[in-house]
Amino acid sequence: ETKQTFDLREGIESTVLILQHRLKANERRPAIEVVTDYGNIPHIACFPGQLNQVFMNILANAVDVLDETSSHQSYRDLEVKSQSITIRTRVEKNWVEVAISDNGPGIPDEVKAKIFDHLFTTKDIGQGTGLGLAIARQIVEEKHGGTLTVQSALGQGTEFCIRLPIGDD
């Protein structure tokens, strides 16, 4: 399997499109807003299908968290402070960065410490496998020579940052 030149923005957009039905308003909450701030990033050599899986895992988790949070808030409160996912891309030296953040409740430190562990999940039995973020990190680090990190504080939301090298290796 060889790497292909790929526009990450296209991968992100197609993933958001797949999740569109989950972002729409429902009886429990208004629509989740997706805000994009695409910096001018180059196409990179990568395995597009694998990176799309990474985007899907992170974005689907963000939707899960916001869905879960909305069950503890009134529709009106959610209209006032809308739930959102922000996707930013930029070039930082020889890296392309994709940052995906939500304005959910944030992650406690003890969960953050284990978030990329194989089989670790905070979801109810039958809801999560504990594989999504472990696989996402493996794809980014082992297959692409990049990094996948998380920053979060309780009450401050969560941001996952994917950094991928620009170049051919």
State each model region's role:
Residues E1, H43-C46, T122:
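Conserved micro-motifs of the catalytic ATP-binding
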Residues R28-H43:
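Conserved catalytic submotifs in the C-terminal HATPase_c
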Residues G132, A136-R137:
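Short alpha-helical Gxxx[C/S/T] motif in the catalytic ATP-binding
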Residues L8, G106-K114, G128:
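Short helix N-cap motif at coil->helix boundaries in the Bergerat
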Residues Q4-L17, V35:
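A conserved beta-strand-to-alpha-helix junction within the catalytic ATP-binding
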Residues V140-E141:
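Detector for a conserved hydrophobic position within an alpha-helical segment of the HATPase_c
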Residues H144-Q151:
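Glycine-rich ATP-binding loops of the HATPase_c
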Residues T2-Q4, K24-A31, V63-V96:
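ATP-lid-like helix-loop hinge signature
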